[in-house]
């Protein structure tokens, strides 16, 4: 009888699913999530009843509870006096899929009944017991991410403004810096758009438009560009110091290809593989090994970069011991910044597999990872621009020049007012001509005084 009812249900279930789908299409946007939840539950129910029909009957001796569907999850045959356990479903936003659901089979081979309702009962209480705290932590991490990328964009744009405004800073390495900074700006902008418009928009994820997958593709591509432009920095220094023996000029075309062109290859391969083997909504899930298509080349770039930089340090230390060249000291300063950045930008990929257990440890881990991942642009601009000795020197020089010019302008305006007052007083006396009242002051014109005061050699005396 039970099998017959199950068979009827399997026959009728596709019609119910069609009705639910039709209702979903006609529902307004605010009810899309409810329709998706219904579809998930009914799909799981359909698969459960298929499993109940197809799996062989329990042949083991002893008492056991029969396989069943409890309304949300499917349960296998369980020996009497045991507790069955599985992960919480992802039907609802306040359910944590990492928590556990339990169902007890009593000594008589019956599923546990709740005393209040006298109905079979599954313990789903742990699924949302920590939801409030986890939502609060998730919001904090979201705001931390937005702040990190916002600060990164601001600092990177200021740095780019400095590099473009002061032509005396122009050189090939600064050109590489500009491209590196621009890739971080693009990545931060796309990340903010992706997080606010896609990842934080359940209705959009449920509809699964092509645009959100394109957004994820661009995001992963630009993330690759960040690390490959860092590799370009390392290759440039290695070629300059080790290979070309302090050569001045290199062809930058290959650097453009490596920094902007090569990351397209893993990004395209990932997109094709994702669409074929793990085509989830908006490609938003990180629970897939296909992400190694993106992370693998990035880790390789970091390792190659680290090798280049360590080799550069070895060569420079050797040169310093032999020749004590001041030029080697300058190159060592340039290498030091890159040598600091490479481990800092790559440590997140070292820490990803080592997620600790425990509520507090996981929370601390999440905060550290978010700081390392989303404040990278701020870190790059600070080390390559704001801590750069040449940049600091030129900013200090221009600031001093501005202060002197401002002070001279103020002094000249005072002198002009004094001269005007003197000439006006003289003009009040009889018989004096004042065709050019401000022509001479102490034998020199105002223009002459300005020229003397604003000569370049007098700016820093």
Swiss-Prot record:
Residues carrying Phosphoserine: 420, 445
Keywords, ordered alphabetically: Cell membrane, Disease variant, Disulfide bond, G-protein coupled receptor, Glycoprotein, Membrane, Phosphoprotein, Receptor, Signal, Transducer, Transmembrane, Transmembrane helix
The record, for PANTHER family, names: CALCITONIN GENE-RELATED PEPTIDE TYPE 1 RECEPTOR, PDF RECEPTOR-LIKE PROTEIN-RELATED
What lineage, starting at the top, does this entry show? Eukaryota, Metazoa, Chordata, Craniata, Vertebrata
Q: What does altering residue 121 to A do?
A: Strongly reduced affinity for adrenomedullin
Question: What pathology is it implicated in?
Answer: Lymphatic malformation 8: A form of primary lymphedema, a disease characterized by swelling of body parts due to developmental anomalies and functional defects of the lymphatic system. Adult patients with lymphedema may suffer from recurrent local infections. Impaired lymphatic drainage in the fetus can develop into hydrops fetalis, a severe condition characterized by excessive fluid accumulation in more than two fetal extra-vascular compartments and body cavities, placental enlargement and edema, pericardial or pleural effusion, or ascites.
Subunit and interaction comment:
Heterodimer of CALCRL and RAMP1; the receptor complex functions as CGRP receptor. Heterodimer of CALCRL and RAMP2 or CALCRL and RAMP3; the complexes function as adrenomedullin receptor.
* Similarity remark: Belongs to the G-protein coupled receptor 2 family.
| Protein name per Swiss-Prot or TrEMBL | Calcitonin gene-related peptide type 1 receptor
Q: Which stretches of sequence are listed as region Required for RAMP3 interaction?
A: 288-289
Residue intervals on the Extracellular side: 23-139, 199-209, 274-289, 352-366
From which source organism is this entry?
Homo sapiens
Q: Where are the transmembrane segments?
A: 140-164, 176-198, 210-238, 253-273, 290-314, 330-351, 367-387
Q: Which cysteines are joined by disulfide bonds?
A: 48-74, 65-105, 88-127
Topology in the lipid bilayer is annotated as: Multi-pass membrane protein
Specify the signal sequence span: 1-22
Which residues does the annotation list for site: Required for ADM2 interaction? Answer: 286, 295, 354
Expression by tissue: Predominantly expressed in the lung and heart.
Q: Which InterPro entries match?
A: GPCR_2, GPCR_2-like_7TM, GPCR_2_calcitonin_rcpt_fam, GPCR_2_CGRP1_rcpt, GPCR_2_extracell_dom_sf, GPCR_2_extracellular_dom, GPCR_2_secretin-like, GPCR_2_secretin-like_CS
Question: Ranges in the Cytoplasmic compartment?
Answer: 165-175, 239-252, 315-329
- Where is the site labelled Required for ADM interaction? 202, 373
Q: Where is this site: Required for RAMP2 interaction?
A: 288
Q: Which residues carry the site feature described as Required for RAMP3 interaction?
A: 250
Q: Which GO terms describe its cellular component?
A: adrenomedullin receptor complex; CGRP receptor complex; cytoplasm; endoplasmic reticulum; endosome; lysosome; plasma membrane
């Amino acid at each position: 009888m039970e099998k017959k009812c199950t068979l009827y249900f399997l026959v009728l279930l596709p019609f119910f699913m069609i009705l639910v789908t039709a209702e979903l299409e006609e529902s307004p946007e605010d009810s899309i999530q409810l329709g998706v939840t219904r579809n998930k539950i009914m799909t799981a129910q359909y698969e459960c009843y298929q499993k109940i029909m197809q799996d062989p009957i329990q042949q083991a001796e002893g008492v056991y509870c029969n396989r069943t569907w409890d309304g949300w999850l499917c349960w296998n045959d369980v020996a009497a006096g045991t507790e069955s356990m599985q992960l919480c479903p992802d039907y609802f936003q306040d359910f944590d899929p990492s928590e556990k659901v339990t169902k007890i089979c009593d000594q008589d081979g019956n599923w546990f009944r709740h005393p209040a309702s006298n109905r079979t009962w599954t313990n789903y209480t742990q699924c949302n017991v920590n939801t409030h705290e986890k939502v609060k932590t998730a919001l904090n991490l979201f705001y931390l991410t937005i702040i990190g990328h916002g600060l990164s964009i601001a600092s990177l744009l200021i740095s780019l403004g400095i590099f473009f405004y002061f032509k005396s800073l122009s050189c090939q390495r600064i050109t590489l810096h500009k491209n590196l900074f621009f890739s971080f700006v693009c990545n931060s902008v796309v990340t903010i758009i992706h997080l606010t418009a896609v990842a934080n928009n359940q209705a959009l994820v449920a509809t699964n438009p092509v645009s959100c997958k394109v957004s994820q593709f661009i995001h992963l591509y630009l993330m690759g560009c960040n690390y490959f432009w860092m590799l370009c920095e390392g290759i440039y220094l290695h070629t300059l110091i080790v290979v070309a023996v302090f050569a001045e000029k290199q062809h930058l075309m290959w650097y453009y290809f490596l920094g902007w062109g090569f990351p397209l290859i893993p990004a395209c391969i990932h997109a094709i593989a994702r669409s074929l083997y793990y085509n989830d909504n908006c490609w938003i899930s990180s629970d897939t090994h296909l992400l190694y298509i993106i992370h693998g080349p990035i880790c390789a770039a970091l390792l190659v970069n680290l090798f280049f930089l360590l080799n550069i340090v070895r060569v420079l230390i050797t040169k310093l011991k032999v020749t004590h060249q001041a030029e080697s000291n300058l190159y060592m300063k340039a290498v030091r910044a890159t040598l600091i950045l490479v481990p800092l930008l790559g440590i997140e990929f070292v820490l990803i597999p080592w997620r600790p257990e425990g509520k507090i440890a996981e929370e601390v881990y999440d905060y550290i990872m978010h700081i390392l991942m989303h404040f990278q642009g701020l870190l790059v601009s600070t080390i390559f621009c704001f801590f750069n000795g040449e940049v600091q020197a030129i900013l200090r020089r221009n600031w001093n020049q501005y202060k002197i010019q401002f002070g001279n302008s103020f002094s000249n305006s005072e002198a002009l007012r004094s001269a005007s007052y003197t000439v006006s007083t003289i003009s009040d006396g009889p018989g004096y001509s004042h065709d050019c009242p401000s022509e001479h002051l102490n034998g020199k014109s105002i223009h002459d005084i300005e020229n003397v005061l604003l000569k370049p050699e007098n700016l820093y005396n």
